[in-house]
Amino acid sequence: MYKHPWLPNLDLTDEMLKEIGVNSLDDLFNDIPAEIKINRLLKVAKDKPLSEYEIEKEIYEKVKKNVELEAPPFIGAGICPHYIPNAVKFIIGRSEFYTSYTPYQPEISQGILQALFEYQSLMAELLEMDVVNASMYDWGSALAEAVLMANRINGKKTVLVPENANPFHKEVMRTWIQGKGIKIEEVKYDKNSGEVDIEDLEKKSSSNDVSAIYVQQPNFFGIFESNIEHIIDVAKHKKALSIIGVNPLSLGLIKPPGSYEADIVVGDGQELGLPLNFGGPLMGIFAVRWDMGLVRQMPGRIVGITRDVNNNMGFTLILQTREQFIKREKATSNITTNEALLALANAVYLSLLGKEGIRELAEEIYFRSHYAAKRLTEIDNVIMPFTSDFFEEFVIKFPIEYNIINDKLKERKLQGGLKLSIHTSLFCVTEVHDKKSIDLLVSTIQEAIKSVETS
């Protein structure tokens, strides 16, 4: 009989195998090809299981190798550092909310259901959209679900995606949609402005097989798409769905997508009270305009208000026949317990800041990112390759290889931007980057360039 070296209470293994008609654990897993099985014990400890104290000591030794940065990271690419009020952390840490339980039973879940309804309402107001679900995994999965949703609605097989959309989101989308035979056709961007090439978009939208047109606002380069309303009109003319990806904080400065009649809106709530993390959760935003054809094809949970037999108002999950626990393979999505806790964090953050707070924060981010860009381009032969206005993120082109600059930044315990090419990098500046941090970044880069030019 199989005996696990550490886990107790496995005496019933043989009895369980017999009950399901299997002779051994090997027989249980015989569907897995032999060539990919690991036929050895995994070395999960040095010689023996470690005690709690030994584990803490080993982890502490590893943690000491971490570098403490002199300033918040200047790398973004869609995940940006922001200040998180302590009230956000405190409220979502309460035991009533800090659970993975899905509120199927409204009679015992009114608290979390109302909190999620408040999130949906706040996000709908911010986006000026009619229906918002109770969260997706992240921006990439929300985009993928939007493309799949468009395909279910109109049956078409091509989605137009700009080259200047976030490449990480596009990779997630490709993974999700490839099994459905949906084709991605990339639209060029103007190399001068950094915005979507409208002429190329109109040319590629001439096909009758275009299911959806996606555009990101601001785009991956941080640039505002000034022709966003025209792009929506192109989608309407071709009877394709418009999918808009938004940075929610940018809506403190620019028109919300609902104001120009976007069909579907996606994004990430990381900007609204969530930390940076290494492989941890994000929070996907998903919203649609009021059209039952769209609403009934939405993925994910939706919380609504109803009344009981005594006419008391209550909160419950609605339109559940869309979901996999009822429809199985015919469901709109297989997402179930999702990022409800993080949606609550977004709701708390939005409630704390309010409309004026969001506007003031967006203005502060705009000012600081423009200050950083101005200071960097004051260095000889350092330029911004794109001319259009930007928010939070921006591209800088250097006269020397960016790897050399990044090495110098790391020496000074600074995290530079995301390398885009040999000489260009995408930088992120938010409200947490003060003048001292930005000036340190600039002086370090200036020093790196000077050292190469004089060598």
UniProtKB/Swiss-Prot annotation:
The protein's Enzyme Commission number: 1.4.4.2
Keywords: Oxidoreductase
Catalytic activity: N(6)-[(R)-lipoyl]-L-lysyl-[glycine-cleavage complex H protein] + glycine + H(+) = N(6)-[(R)-S(8)-aminomethyldihydrolipoyl]-L-lysyl-[glycine-cleavage complex H protein] + CO2
An individual GO BP term: nucleoside metabolic process
GO MF assignments: glycine dehydrogenase (decarboxylating) activity
UniProt enzyme class: oxidoreductase
InterPro entries: GcvPA, GDC-P_N, GDC_P, PyrdxlP-dep_Trfase, PyrdxlP-dep_Trfase_major, PyrdxlP-dep_Trfase_small
SUPFAM superfamilies assigned: PLP-dependent transferases (SSF53383)
Assembly information from the UniProt record: The glycine cleavage system is composed of four proteins: P, T, L and H. In this organism, the P 'protein' is a heterodimer of two subunits.
Family from the record: Belongs to the GcvP family. N-terminal subunit subfamily.
Free-text function comment from the UniProt entry: The glycine cleavage system catalyzes the degradation of glycine. The P protein binds the alpha-amino group of glycine through its pyridoxal phosphate cofactor; CO(2) is released and the remaining methylamine moiety is then transferred to the lipoamide cofactor of the H protein.
Protein name in the entry: Probable glycine dehydrogenase (decarboxylating) subunit 1
